[in-house]
């Protein structure tokens, strides 16, 4: 068949040319071409009138006339059925601009529906004649317009300062390109790769976790960022709390682990180290903007929390807060403010959720409870209500001491702050954390839908007392008593019924002030595990649903059972926590950029404790300008050193030594030799004097007598020095320098009269008085000024040695790095 001439004509079939011709007619026609002309063209094409040679081509007209020619039946090859179907489907009849075939019409509409054509919403009809396609496009455009209107309405409801900004389209299909030039966008054209905002990060699309905004903040798109520039913390702090440095990176570095040790709705906690002592690790509490908070409100809220925490930091049961610093944007955190705080080992909740907590003795649990109560009492004594007390906000130090933290919603409870004679300021609104929030506060919970007649102002001090009682019940029962402290919780209703039944049938005076009769017994579910009715009295009185009869902190500390609880730490003990150093400051507002230059005429030793007086250096090095103005001024200063004890002139250090006569040099050399011979005598004298001073300052059982003797005879130390200097001897290299016999006898007598003892290490030191401390905080208590011979022995508690059989608990996964 290859040699047949007719077959060659079949091979030269101009089907491609026919399709090109049809395409040119479609695109060159007007937008409203008459359908009859198109139908005619199709018929002409189908009948083969426009073809040069197509004797074997079948008719593609829809009428069925004009079948195969006689020449095609003579030697034409057979056509496959699929080819016939394909050619028959190509028979197009344009009626109203739509495809006549039902199947092809459905396929085309489905293709348009899922197509992402950027020119789909163009105002000019690129396809020309199609009205069906345009109608589908109009419907899609209407749907997208409605979605954009809804998005604009949601942005207005957010009430942010950038809500009125033009919103980006959600897809390329909804964007218009009529008169726009294509501009390079480094952030991509995908709506998920939204351009990061300088003020807010919550407007970013979170459909994909790996968008560009993930690298611009902590990974949580709900975190809002402060606008630049970040305010100076010193502008919001009182004069006695202003800081030498306000930048985090000046004196601190992030921990290499780069793992947060805690996070909440308004903050995140990470580890930082001192730039000068890598062993000194602290906690950085990075503060975040919440809800619809403006930057000004954020600064006021954070500065208020810092002032309250700083004001309470001089107590052993309060977590020390050192500095309020500006945090830059790094790979660890976003820009903003942050606190430098004392780092805790664990929190109380982590201890309570351990499997070995149920086996902890009651006296150790009561010890922890009393420590928390002492911290709350200290806050109330200083005019501050915590208002968010819960086990998660009680940190445990490495010595096993409970420390309160998180003063984010704390407030002064007096009408006039710092005026303790002013009345108590009541509060309104829902604050705190259920179930530690009392019933009078739960009435303000919008989710409970309580009527306004129940929403009355409440006392914030009673709120702390209730939380303390629920915490004690949780510590003893190893489970939270109820979820919410309101009548919508079945277990709380059961607690209220039990409370009323105990008062009505067993102890009618249970709520009376000063009544210390036994509390509920084992017949009540929330009192069964106490094993002590006096302990249940404390817990139930603190958790009284009625705030009018609830235990106050004064009532608690007057309770006989509470007074008998032994603790391993006293509230007046010193808390030896190293204060981080601030050696460098890059702030240009209030301080010099050079950390070595003092901000005033006298060098100031900056301290983080506002209650300590600032120490000033008595002498300041002269500048080159002062030396040039008064070169003849000579300031004599004595330099005390173990190797050099000569007197020199400050004014002679500028190169005048080279012009001295040789005779004067010889005299000075002779003086130096004499000084060297007497160096060891003076070293012994200074060491002995230092030892005497240190021993006199340390507490002893007879420290009162020592102070009396010193007050009556102020020349005691002068006599000791004179005895040492009476007969100096030449030191030898074979052994220590012997003291004169007379001087030694007098010194021994004087030392025995003053009951002085030689200083020995704390580990081998034996006191004549009873042991003052042997607990986990013994290193901090030894040598404390509060130690006296009449003080009772402290108990030994190992609060951090609670066993845990579960190695990885989901609830503490964020705290494993501690």
Swiss-Prot record:
Cellular component per GO, a single term: nucleus
Biased amino acid composition, Basic and acidic residues: 136-160, 638-651, 659-685
Pfam family, one: Pkinase
Disulfide bonds: none
Keywords in alphabetical order: ATP-binding, Cytoplasm, Kinase, Nucleotide-binding, Nucleus, Phosphoprotein, Serine/threonine-protein kinase, Transferase
Active site: 388 (proton acceptor)
PROSITE patterns linked: PROTEIN_KINASE_ATP, PROTEIN_KINASE_DOM, PROTEIN_KINASE_ST
Cellular compartments annotated: Nucleus; Cytoplasm
Residues that hold ATP according to the record: 261-269, 285
Enzyme class: transferase
EC number from the UniProt entry: 2.7.11.1
A GO term, aspect molecular function: ATP binding
Region ranges (Disordered): 28-100, 117-177, 585-795
Protein kinase domain span: 255-562
Record-linked InterPro entries: Kinase-like_dom_sf (IPR011009), Prot_kinase_dom (IPR000719), Protein_kinase_ATP_BS (IPR017441), Ser/Thr_kinase_AS (IPR008271)
GO biological process: G1/S transition of mitotic cell cycle; G2/M transition of mitotic cell cycle; intracellular monoatomic ion homeostasis; putrescine transport; regulation of cell size; spermidine transport; spermine transport
More details: Present with 1420 molecules/cell in log phase SD medium.
Function: Essential determinant for high-affinity spermidine transport. Required for the activation of the plasma membrane proton pump PMA1 via phosphorylation of 'Ser-899'.
Record-given protein name: Serine/threonine-protein kinase PTK2/STK2
Gene encoding the protein: PTK2
